[in-house]
């Protein structure tokens, strides 16, 4: 009788263990668009621009590898309450995880998972082309962890028009293959440089990934330079609807703001953007966050030398194109300078009322081409102004 009871207990225990294993496996099984990803080691040569798609899929721009990599973060649980992320010395915490000093950590981009509200950072262990790429997750409790790339559902697509490396150039074009990304209506929009005559490019890549066609290349009027330009990459952009039409609002170094019709961004097309604002020279835009507050539309723009700007976006369709040298350094769409935000290095939307910023002292170099920020680097939640 005792033996029989023991066997029954063992059988029940095994059944519970199997059921638990199935439950865990089901919880980890990719869903939605993430189900198209396959487990294995994600091969990244660098980790730069980030963007989130549906179902917790994180897109990583790998400029050195000339590819975009989609990762299943397995991070699809919504928080039970309002999230505020505040972490002092996040670079110090990352350095401790990988066994280096904080000055060997460079944070390249910041995005918030729209489902879980966890913060994701692309970073590098070391400096230069041989640096080790890292993807870092920070939760609302301030816990910092690495997203393992060794066995993760993923997929990648190679860019057919990536520029060749040129270490003798003032700024290596290969390192600017991907400068910013956004997921827009089933496509990953990828800004950066290409190997075309008009080297400034915007690529539209359908997801799930199959192949990437060549991007559209761009020409813009740069009023502070007094000329049309085709070689300067978009630094940051957001999709935006103006009078019912889909546009890309793109910001460039020194600092034209340009609208580009999405309908014209066909493979191989040469597209002329329309400059609608000149925000000021001697500056590099870092990130943009569009939002609505008190019945009005705004775009918050983080910059290297201009600080944080609050752009009024209610009537973007009413501003005439800027296509000739301007008398002043600032023209077009009006904005307010926000002096209460200092040393912002990264900006990302958290929800409809808040954003997350990464702050740190500016690195060496001119403000339009700054070096890596100097730590300590801090994550902070702010209210959208």
Describe the predicted segments one by one.
Residues 25-385:
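Sequence/structural signature of beta-propeller domains
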Residues 11-21:
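Bacterial N-terminal signal peptides
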Residues 1-7:
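N-terminal secretory signal peptides that target proteins for export/translocation
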Residues 5, 24-25:
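General helical secondary-structure elements
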Residues 2, 21-22:
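Helix-centric, low-specificity signal for extended rod-like, repetitive segments
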